[in-house]
Every structure is written in structure tokens, then in C-alpha cells.
């Protein structure tokens, strides 16, 4: 499966900790991330991550483009609900695209944990039919 990782600045450390905790599961999949998030997670975990531009330079839009082509199977987007509204258009676009293509998205660690454990159980195997290239 293709998994996208995105985290607002104040949530990057939480994303790193989450990926360290679930490194064994994440290592079985193809990972991509916005630039800074990907760099931090890769350095902390040793996971192989395709890195896009930093979020504020278009990385979220690059991931959104892959979502629009149904090339991403799961999005983990740890967003900061207290951040300024400058991020909101990107967040809404990505969420809308995930809804359009039935791509699971977690915007907090509680939901991310449920999705990652479901992924490990095989609950998301139906995505292999939708996106056979992600195997």
C-alpha cells in the first residue's frame, strides 16, 4: 500500500513518535511524505520514504495530486487544529479528495492508530483492487 505522511510543524514530533512505534508495520508499505516530515521520520526510524517538497512549498499539493489519481491508499495527516488558517485550503482539498476516492485519512493520532492496526490486520486489503500498483 502507498501511505502518505504529513504533519504540521507542531505535530511533527508526534508523527516521528508514531512512526517509531509502528515502524514494523510501516516498513511493509511504500511511504511518501512532505519534505520536512519525511526527513525527520526517515532519520528517526530508518524507513525508506519518498520525500516531496515541504508542505508550505507545495508538498501537500503534490500528495493531493497523487490522491486525485487514486495512487495513495492511506493518508496520515497530523494537523494542528490550533494553527492559523493559512493551512486550511490545503487540508480541505486533501480531505475532499480522500472522500471522493474513498481513501482513509487520519488527522489525529487516535484515528491513525486505528487505521494502522486495521491495515496490519488486512482491513484495507480492498484498496489493492482499487490501486493494484501499490502492492
Predicted segment positions?
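N-terminal phosphate-binding or glycine-rich loops at protein starts, especially the Walker A/P-loop
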Residues: 1-27
